[in-house]
């Protein structure tokens, strides 16, 4: 079963706990720029991209606004050698920074990329939007070269029972999203064990799977950016604090 029935989970964080965490005093240890740089160095999605082999060809599936392309140049090490191809349901302005792109509705017609084979796949916050998450594993098995690696990220079960965004905002914690169903385009939450089985059926070995947590950096981000106009660092700290996202890294045999 790809979507498990609801069952007891680790206790999620409630409104009072989140508000107390958000408002507690903090003293930064880094300057603001360095805190952002370090966050985007240690985030598993970016570190995966940065450590790919020289001249790797990368499929960015569910590329959104195309911001993954920014990480070729920042932070260090620069990776202008990466050959990146974007896929989404519609074109974003940053898609022109890629070597190529394709747009379609995955549920009707996944991308073909003119028959290209890839050294790596990055798929972040996409499988919770499609009808059959296992179809990504099948696509990766067909389009990644032997030894090619896949990074897949999506919300964790801990996101399901968080307070709604509107409740946290009323309590003084402004966010873009809190609970999984704050985003009405989300379908049901794909189960990690089922995704691992789908990858194995399609010829992949699992390297690592887990929850994304960066506790020290979430404190740095809030020390600098809790009340900033740019809400992304605040949101990133919340995602880390709540264990909002999970990921898998797998290698095609």
Across the structure, where does each feature detected by a protein language model lie?
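Conserved N-terminal segment of class I S-adenosyl-L-methionine
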Residues: 1-116, 120-124, 137, 210-214, ...
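S-adenosyl-L-methionine-dependent methyltransferase catalytic module, highlighting the catalytic core
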Residues: 6-10, 14-17, 21-25, 131-140, ...
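Short loop segments at secondary-structure junctions
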Residues: 252-253
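Short conserved AdoMet
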Residues: 53, 131, 145
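Short catalytic micro-motifs in class I SAM-dependent methyltransferases
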Residues: 125-129
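Residue-level signal for threonine
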Residues: 92, 145, 158
């Amino acid at each position: 079963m790809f979507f498990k029935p609801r069952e007891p989970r680790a206790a999620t964080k409630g409104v009072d706990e989140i508000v107390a965490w958000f408002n507690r005093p903090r003293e930064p240890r880094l300057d603001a720029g360095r805190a952002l740089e370090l966050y985007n160095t240690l985030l598993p999605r970016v570190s995966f991209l940065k450590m790919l082999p020289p001249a790797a060809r990368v499929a960015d599936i569910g590329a959104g606004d195309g911001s993954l392309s920014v990480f070729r140049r920042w932070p260090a090490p620069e990776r202008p050698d990466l050959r990146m191809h974007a896929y989404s349901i519609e074109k974003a302005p940053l898609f022109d920074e890629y070597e190529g792109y394709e747009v379609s509705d995955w549920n009707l017609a996944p991308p073909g990329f003119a028959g290209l084979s890839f050294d790596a796949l990055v798929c972040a916050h996409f499988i919770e939007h499609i009808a059959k998450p296992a179809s990504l594993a099948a696509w990766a098995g067909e389009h990644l070269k032997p030894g090619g690696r896949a990074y897949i990220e999506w919300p964790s079960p801990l996101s399901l029972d968080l307070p709604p965004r509107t409740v946290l905002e009323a309590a003084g914690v402004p966010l873009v999203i809190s609970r999984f169903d704050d985003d009405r385009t989300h379908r049901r939450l794909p189960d990690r064990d089922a995704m691992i089985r789908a990858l194995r059926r399609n010829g992949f070995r699992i390297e690592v799977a887990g929850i994304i947590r960066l506790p020290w950096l979430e404190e740095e981000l809030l020390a600098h950016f809790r009340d900033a106009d740019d809400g992304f660092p605040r949101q990133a700290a919340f995602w880390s604090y709540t264990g909002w996202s999970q990921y898998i890294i797998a290698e095609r045999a």
